[in-house]
A protein has these predicted regions:
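N-terminal intrinsically disordered, cationic/polar leader segments
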Residues: 1-94, 98-142
Length: 142
């Protein structure tokens, strides 16, 4: 497992924003999996973009965390048709506790209460990605 990229921008301090009350937290998640040159090894990368904003008519950014966290997985004895779902559901599920801790630590070290991410439903995320990919493919002519 490894941190590929980590960024924390404390916009509130930089721009003099004073946060009143509970902020709005937006979380975006993207997943990627690639075969490595070593047989049966795969890189799985989880990309998170987390933005905290004030709850106003014109919201202002409080902080932004961007994290790319990866794992190298040796996968054997899995049927070919089950490999992609395994890489995009089970592998991220194994990485998530570490991602959650990093996000919590970074937000706390940035001077804010620790941000404890809710569990991510990787099955739903996978289904959404499959549906989006199917919608982008051109339809055959009748």
């Amino acid at each position: 497992q490894f941190i590929r990229d980590l960024s924390f921008e404390n916009a509130a301090v930089q721009n003099g924003v004073v946060a009143q009350g509970q902020p709005e937290i937006q979380v975006q998640v993207a997943l990627d999996a690639r075969k490595r040159t070593v047989e049966n090894q795969y890189d799985v990368i989880m990309k998170l973009k987390i933005e905290s904003k004030t709850k106003e008519d014109a919201p202002k950014s409080i902080f932004l965390i961007e994290l790319e966290y990866g794992g190298v997985f040796l996968i054997e004895n899995i049927a070919e048709q089950q490999l992609h779902p395994f890489l995009m559901i089970e592998c991220p599920r194994m990485l998530f506790p570490f991602v959650r801790r990093i996000i919590s630590d970074v937000s706390r070290d940035g001077g804010y209460p620790p941000l404890n991410l809710d569990q991510i439903d990787f099955v739903s995320l996978y289904r959404q990605q499959i549906a989006a990919r199917a919608a982008q493919q051109p339809q055959g002519s009748a």
